[in-house]
């Protein structure tokens, strides 16, 4: 609501409607009523590997159908399959590529990583109206202000990107001790 009030084209994407859209496409493509899509847990869609294997359907084909269906849904900017992530076949947008890759874990991540369009929020139904989320690929969602204040700390501004790995060395330097 805040982004809309500020004039940004934003909306909340309902995961129930998105998943209904995807399931419809999967059922039509593979001519089955079997539940090949197991669940959505932001930002991933998980597939039912056992059932896909039982039905003798290629897992990568299902990933592709799911990704293409997701990208046709209003508010979804990109969908990366686990196969594409493993092969390094990701979007040319280097910041997006790095964030998708850094979020991926072969044993825990889902089969399709969804990216909502900028200023849109892909809401998982279990969130029950919680106001925020983590893990988007857009830079404005990754800005976290870092402040250091205390005796002997002069006013300063750092304009380069900083991360958690910068905090400990900064504090160590202030304390005059060896950084971890």
Q: Where would I find each of the regions flagged by the language model?
A:
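Second-shell loop/turn segments in exported
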Residues: 50-57, 132-134, 153-161
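His/Asp/Glu-rich mid-to-C-terminal helical/loop segments that flank catalytic regions of hydrolases
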Residues: 148-166, 170
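Secreted, luminal/periplasmic, and some membrane-associated catalytic domains
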Residues: 1-125
